Amino acid sequence: MLAIFCDTPGQLSARELPKPARGEGEVLVRIRRIGVCGTDLHIFTGNQPYLSYPRVMGHELSGTVEQAPDGSVLSHGDVVTIIPYMSCGHCSACLKGKSNCCRNIGVLGVHRDGGMVEYLSVPQQFVLKAEGLTLDQAAMTEFLAIGAHAVRRGAVEQDQQVLIVGAGPIGMAVAVFAVLNGGVVTMIDSRADRLDFCKTHLGAAHVVALGEGDKDQLSDITSGDFFDVVFDATGNPKAMERGFSFVGHGGSYVLVSIVASDISFNDPEFHKRETTLLGSRNATPDDFERVMEALRAGKVPEALITHRMALSEVPSKFAGLTDPKAGVIKGMVEVA
């Protein structure tokens, strides 16, 4: 089978590997779609922590069942999506129902080889039947689930003022589910094309260009009260620190992105506003189900997918996805 390796930062290669045998208790999946996310781009550019090379990237996956264990609810040919967070099931986080925070987590495409392959054998508890979804929709489920989980953490309610800082794919995923919860969503970002997409396709009520006077605009939108819930999806420590100033009294600040460095905030302001600070990590099976329900109902625009390539084209075309001028939102790799 064909597999794409990131050998070193900036260097991809195609290799022929034996088709894997189905492991005990596992499902052999014929991979059909691989969504490209920021993690893959960071691996390619050499900016992903906790990673060793060479590595097969890819964790936003869909495919069809090639072979399932006896007694499985899955059958040959079923369209499936894959939860890429391989959790242990017995640590304190898993036992509390927070498999997304497993102490022994192994993420496909990061800690172990991922899905830029033709076939992958995956423990059956991480393979979800994507009934009623297209292969594209099923491959979008993972990144959308990160947004759905963040919105659940922030407990967005009807008519709340919601600010999302960062209009990349994860920020857009947050926007989708904040709008579905009834939030009045404002997006702030430096890229006009992405802000326009958020307003045109995702239901954002307001968009603000990052730069001089942006805080005044945010104040005007909320009549000076600022926001009930603020989400950071930038992965930038300075932006994360600045985000505290956008939270209204009694509001919540949800950090969806993660950085390796420390961040700081003004403690008197934090206490004066009685701010709630939350982290949001990965997603749980419940979030995946929530996303698939929304996809089946036609509530998520497939226009999020802007670029496509075949698996065999990845070594030659992948670098183009890193160019801001290309207007990439979500790249999708197709496996014949």
Stretch-by-stretch model annotation:
Residues 1, 241, 285, 289-336:
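C-terminal hydrophobic helical "lid"/dimerization subdomain
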Residues 18-34, 47-92, 131-133:
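Glycine-rich beta-strand-centered segment in the early N-terminal region that forms part
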Residues 60, 78-79, 93, 119, ...:
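Residue-level marker of beta-strand positions
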Residues 74-75, 156, 247:
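Short, well-ordered loop/turn sites that connect or cap secondary structure elements
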Residues 88-165:
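NAD(P)H dinucleotide-binding glycine-rich loop of Rossmann-like/cofactor-binding domains
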Residues 133-212:
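Mid-domain Rossmann-like dinucleotide-binding core that forms the NAD(H)/NADP(H) cofactor-binding site
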Residues 213-224:
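Short amphipathic alpha-helix with an adjacent loop that forms part of the alpha/beta core around
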Residues 237-297, 334-336:
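Glycine-rich phosphate-binding loop and adjacent beta-alpha segment
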